[in-house]
Each structure stands twice: as structure tokens, then as C-alpha cells.
């Protein structure tokens, strides 16, 4: 079965959501407790959005749920660990979480260029908003860490 452009766009959103959640879950133990506590509500909401999006895309676009890209995930995990050897582990993680958000924002933006049912658009808007809020939180913590390094 071939996918049309809007199905491809929505498939990309589903994959980006799955990758984002998977990356966070795989690396949560590496985050300081304060960072983990700050970021968890965003990812908890993201689980809800992912489930809602899967339901709506299955209903309206005949798309099946996407899993995270395991090979890419393994590569990202290894690369992150290597970078953490020479840099601050939390800073590396924040930068990589920001990159995950950029990928998700781009996928959402692309999906918004296609005609979609209102129920899917509503969930996409929730994803976009969640993504923007998490980016602000990540930058807030990134700036806080930079300020602490300068103070030392």
C-alpha cells in the first residue's frame, strides 16, 4: 500500500513522537532528579497525545502506529554516551532533547500543510504546543546550567 503525502506527513509525526518518547525514557536515569521532575509532565502529556494521534490517524487515514527507529535510537544512545565523556552529561542530554523537539516541530509543521480532519488537527495543535512548551523549559534549564558554570 502506497501512502499519499498527508499520510506520509502524519507518519513522520508519529515516528518523531515515538522517537522523542523513547529517547527520553532511555535516558531519564541520566538526568538530575530536578531536571527529570521538570521534564516528566511534558512527556506524560506526550504519551496521551501520541495515543490520541494514533487513534485518529487510524480512523481517518488508515495509518498504523509507528514505533521508534531502534537502530537510530541505539546510535543516538551510544553517541550521547560518548559525548558525555568529554562534556557535562546533563548539558549533552538537554541539547539532544532539543534536537528531538526540532525534529518533532518540523514534522508537525509539514503535517499542517496538508488538509487534515479537525480531530487530527486538534491533536497536532496539542503536540505543537507541548513541543514549544518543552523547548522553553529545556532552554530555561540550559541557561541555568550555563549561569552555574560561569559562577564557578
Describe the residue ranges of each PLM region.
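Alpha-helical bundle segments that constitute or directly flank the non-heme di-iron/ferroxidase center
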Residues: 1-31, 90-118, 134
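Short, charged, amphipathic alpha-helical segments
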Residues: 11, 36-44, 95-99, 121-129
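Conserved alpha-helical segments that form or flank metal/cofactor-binding pockets of metalloenzymes
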Residues: 37-72, 138-146
